[in-house]
Amino acid sequence: MDQMKLVDRVLDKSSNKIIALKNVTINEPCFRDHIIDNEPVLPGSIILEVIGQVGDILLGTVTYLAKVDSMRFYEKTIPGDQLKIEVVKLKSIGKIHKLIGVGTVDGKRHVELKFTVREDDE
């Protein structure tokens, strides 16, 4: 699983909230093929995975994405950006958790994701 570890550092963590960083570098393989308007852009699927991994760290367990309630991109995330991810647990029922994740770069909102995950049964 280490080859898919996308979270670089956890800055703060409580029982219901976590703040973490993803340093976006040109060396990431996704930039070879994801060019928009002659500019490498971090794919939304990778951003979704980063936010999901931050959620897993918050919950302290491996989860599976059950539902994307909403996802909105406000700005492109490009090499050199430091994506600050804040994930908040909104509600938990058993092994099902509703979360919201917000990604910012230099204080400017890049993405917001409302999602539901299910804990691994093992």
Regions found by a protein language model. Name each.
Residues G52-E86:
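Hydrophobic beta-strand-centered segment that forms part of the acyl-chain substrate-binding groove
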Residues V24, L59, V105-G107:
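Generic helix-packing signal
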Residues D2-L42:
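Catalytic strand-loop segment that frames the active site of acyl-thioester-processing enzymes
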